[in-house]
Each structure stands twice: as structure tokens, then as C-alpha cells.
Amino acid sequence: MASPSFCLLAALLALVSWQAIASDPSPLQDFCVADKHSPVLVNGFACLDPKYVTADHFFKAAMLDTPRKTNKVGSNVTLINVMQIPGLNTLGISIARIDYAPLGENPPHTHPRATEILTVLEGTLYVGFVTSNPNNTLFSKVLNKGDVFVFPEGLIHFQFNPNPHQPAVAIAALSSQNPGAITIANAVFGSKPPISDKVLAKAFQVEKGTIDWLQAQFWENNHY
């Protein structure tokens, strides 16, 4: 019969192994600049030979230039991830600037691979996230300039500028070199090919004609 100490050791090893699998591994060298032309397929990118690495691999110019806000939802997300800065490969971090028109919003979405921490630079934002089933609890807050809010990894969240006259600006840091974004309405009603209207009518408990109308809309992407 196994001793209590052996059982405890086995449990601790199992816990440590699970935690190691559940998160990105730590870098094993100073940096691993993404080699986007490498034929090697890995989870992320293969490393560029260090002798070819320059400071430009860790640099992106003029991120804070004001981008467009002309889409229907009234916001623009400018993401700086490993695709823009190859030096972010294996470092587990990226950053985004979000510009909101008056009454603009960053609609409900998730980041499947990252936690987000948002800081308001200008204006006011109403923000929130919803927990998983079965409770679906909404945690929301009105943020002003300098305020910070956290959106846990994978949970549906949003930001809305309630001011009808003034724009707002925020910066978000995300805990992945490639956090991904799934905008809920776009994914459900704008998938290609479309989800069966019978499936969605049943799921949302509405008439099929309502689903057909929603699927006929142009679901604009505000992430660039």
C-alpha cells in the first residue's frame, strides 16, 4: 500500500504538470524572434537565427497615431502582436490601442488565448464581462481617464463609450503574443458558411425570419 507521503508527492507532481501544460512555456533563451518564413510548423513561430536579429525586430513605429473610427460599431482596435513585432514570439504579451467614437463600442467578444488589462487614456467607458455557465454573472464598471479594468481569459467582454459628444481612447495589454479575438455577433450571424437558421432560431428562441434578417446584415470587423 502506498504511503501517505508518496500519495502527496504524486498529487503535487500531477498538479505541477497540469499547470505546466495549461500555460505557455517560459522562454529558454533571451529571445526567439519569429521567423515567419521558416517551413517548420510549431505552436507559435520558429526562431530566427540570432545573428540576423536587429533592433527593428522589437520595434513598431507610430502606434499612437489616431486611426480610423468609421465602421458601424464606432470603434477601431489596433493590435500590436507577434505579426507586427516578431520579437514578441514566446514572450506571452501584446498590446492594443482602442479608439471609440461618441457612442461607439467594442462589441461583445472574447480573447481565447489571453487575459486583458485595459487602461482608459481619454474619455469615459462603460465596460464589463460575463462569467461562464450556469450563472452568466455580469461584472461591469464605468471607467474614467486613468482607470484600469481586467477581463479574464476567454470570457465575453465589451466596452462602450456613453458620451454622445466626446471620443474615448484606451490601451489594452494582453497575456499572449497572439491573443485572438472572437466577436460574438460576427461569429454567430456572420460565419462562412452560415450556421443553419433552424439551429440559431432554436438557440435564440426567435422566428427563423429574424435569424435570416440578422444573417443578411454586414457584420463589420473592428479589429485591424
Swiss-Prot record:
Residues 62-212 form the Cupin type-1 domain. It is found in: Secreted, Extracellular space, Apoplast. InterPro entries: Cupin_1, Germin, Germin_Mn-BS, RmlC-like_jellyroll, RmlC_Cupin_sf. Glycans are attached at residues 76, 135. Its main location: secreted. Residues 1-22 form the signal peptide. PROSITE patterns: GERMIN. Disulfide bonds join 32-47. Mn(2+) binds at residues 109, 111, 116, 157. The keyword Signal applies. Keywords: Apoplast, Disulfide bond, Glycoprotein, Manganese, Metal-binding, Secreted, Signal. GO terms for molecular function: manganese ion binding. Gene3D superfamilies: Jelly Rolls (2.60.120.10). The keyword Transcription does not apply. GO terms for cellular component: apoplast. Oligomer (believed to be a pentamer but probably hexamer). Belongs to the germin family. Plays a role in broad-spectrum disease resistance. Probably has no oxalate oxidase activity even if the active site is conserved. Member of the 12 germin-like protein gene cluster located on chromosome 8 in the major-effect quantitative trait loci (QTL) for fungal blast resistance. Partial suppression of the 12 germin-like protein genes increases susceptibility to the fungal pathogens causing rice blast and sheath blight diseases. This is Germin-like protein 8-8. It comes from Oryza sativa subsp. japonica. The lineage of its organism: Eukaryota, Viridiplantae, Streptophyta, Embryophyta, Tracheophyta.
